[in-house]
């Protein structure tokens, strides 16, 4: 059957509505009837030019090429616009409205939640709308997208990947408004120093070059900076020159500088066989959450927006600790605990034991070390499989009052969810960075006898489509074993 449009076709569209994940919706009438077009990073009120990347009988997915007309409500920005902040020109209140409406639509359609008016507790905004990130990754490329001519040129570039490409970068010449003003307003000087060495930037299609990535991690607690320059091993790096440059540009805030060798052809910072070493200063910066300090290395996973993460964890604490102190002998479990951030925060504020469980032994070692450093005593960490935990530690059977889940974006697999059920917890606090997979998992949790009691959204990433969610589920009494 002939379709209304074909792959590669360029369309001019008026965006009328929003779908979850930052997809603008255009509705068209064709010879074959109503047709829906989704355009990533477009939003209502805009007229855009977009290219079809996938076409079905009644809908198409498009890549945004350019905005032809802005929406009436869009704001003028004091920052350089970047691909990673598609909503930067949208008033924050409207961003919250879109995130709420599109997320709740998922819980209705995918999760089958019929009582959202009763359980939804609103959206928690980020304390900071601008300069909230604590880490930024900049890419080098020999292919630069010129923002003035909107063309690709052969040139030394350092900045962000141009939207829809993996090979071309847009030079960052000014503060983007998301990270650190000092770092980003002087990044062009780092680019010029690297270019002056005569060594080439990475050429993604040809898979060759020298300079690959510059990663900067920042402590929001004290402003300290950790810098990692990623190169191939094709030539020696002028280490002294690079260290002098970074310290001159960013001063006493620089706490450590690393050099990572990465000869992998893939477009990622971490190399499978490369090595990373400290060439000046320390290997970590210190971040503080709820009065606890955490040493964060360049490779550590840590919340990107610490100020908003404090609000997220405050919501988790309120739910996890509710009623537990009136139940002597009960325990709270932090499942998939990683390096134990949530578990330590809970333990600091609880008068009950907290148990952290993760299948990765190194993560558990790091969690124990961090708890010792913070003086948190009523938390125990175990390297164990969730499904076997009660068999290996029968002393906790019947004592798990609340289990806190914080899985990756993919959510919880059915197999893992069955393991969670074996823990026989009375309550589950489910933290999610992807409401779509959380909504899917709520269906299975409901069939296993858990009822959704409350749901709250948390805006961790202003100016993007991302939103996090915290859900409380309780075992239905008449189904409890």
Where are these regions (language model features)?
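Terminal RNA-binding accessory module
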Residues: 1-78, 160, 165, 380, ...
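Rossmann-like S-adenosyl-L-methionine
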Residues: 2-9, 20, 24, 234-481
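Short beta-strand micro-motifs enriched in acidic
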Residues: 51-55, 139-145, 217-221, 474
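Peripheral terminal and linker regions in Fe-S/redox and tRNA-modifying enzymes
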Residues: 57, 66, 135, 147, ...
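Conserved loop-to-beta-strand segment in the C-terminal subdomain of adenylate-forming
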Residues: 59, 222-226, 465
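Extended interfacial segments that mediate partner engagement and assembly in macromolecular machines
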Residues: 65-203, 221
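Internal alpha/beta scaffold segment
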Residues: 166-212, 233-259, 265
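Short, aliphatic-rich beta-strand segments
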Residues: 216, 223-232, 293-297
